[in-house]
Amino acid sequence: MQLFHLCLIISCSCPTVQASKLCLGWLWGMDIDPYKEFGASVEVLSFLPSDFFPSNRDLLDTASALDREALESPEHCSPHHTALRQAILCWGELMNLATWVGSNLEDPASRELVVSYVNVNMGLKIRQLLWFHISCLTFGRETVLEYLVSFGVWIRTPPAYRPPNAPILSTLPETTVVRRRGRSPRRRTPSPRRRRSQSPRRRRSQSRESQC
């Protein structure tokens, strides 16, 4: 989809991103959200500011360090690994396209427009995807979803009524007060008392009689 946006920008005489999106909606008429099957949404991810996400290079290094074996495996490991593979391949193709445009597009203004669009707009979307799936594999999907809700509540609360610092994902499981639905705290049933063969008093009386 994003590659088609770029093709429209390059080929149109009056290129606009809005026009390419309208054209795509007319062609397909689909509203695809890459986070929907994981319980999140593009809107929820948009609560996090753009400078929150590490660079693509750092995220790719993290994915390689933590999940390289699973990402290179021919077997299906998890939906998050599959999504990571697709995002990594997509970013690689975008870099190839940006390099090709920079080398072959004669108009400097158009060349700068395309390269900037790839690095800024599409780069942010790839950073969001990489961060989400790496975090789900590291901390667990439920923890990441709780974090997104907590951050969304924090960022939309007026500064005078919220804590000075935003929630931190790595410490969320220790500080969260939200209880999971459908689970009640377990009550320990009292264990049956064991019968004592002889009470302490009886033992003492027997010992005294033996001494006499």
Swiss-Prot record:
BP-aspect Gene Ontology terms: microtubule-dependent intracellular transport of viral material towards nucleus; symbiont entry into host cell; viral penetration into host nucleus
Post-translational modification: Phosphorylated.
Pfam families: Hep_core_N, Hepatitis_core
Feature: compositional bias, Basic residues: 178-205
Compartments, as annotated in UniProt: Secreted; Host nucleus
Propiece span(s): 184-212
Statement: the UniProt record of this protein carries the keyword Repeat: yes
Single Gene Ontology MF annotation: DNA binding
Region described as 3 X 8 AA repeats of S-P-R-R-R-R-S-Q: 184-206
Site residues, Cleavage: R183, S184
Residue ranges, annotated region (HBEAG): 25-27
InterPro entries registered for this protein in UniProt: Hepatitis_B_virus_capsid_N, Hepatitis_core, Viral_capsid_core_dom_sf_HBV
Sequence repeats: 184-190, 191-198, 199-206
Source domain of life: Viruses
Region spans: Disordered: 165-212
Keyword match Disulfide bond: yes
Signal peptide annotation: 1-19
Alphabetized UniProt keyword annotations: Disulfide bond, Host nucleus, Host-virus interaction, Repeat, Secreted, Signal, Viral immunoevasion
Cellular component, GO, one term: extracellular region
Protein role: May regulate immune response to the intracellular capsid in acting as a T-cell tolerogen, by having an immunoregulatory effect which prevents destruction of infected cells by cytotoxic T-cells. This immune regulation may predispose to chronicity during perinatal infections and prevent severe liver injury during adult infections.
Subunit relationships: Homodimerizes.
Family: Belongs to the orthohepadnavirus precore antigen family.
The name this protein goes by in its record: External core antigen
Organism: Hepatitis B virus genotype C subtype ayw (isolate China/Tibet127/2002) (HBV-C)
Gene, per the UniProt record: C
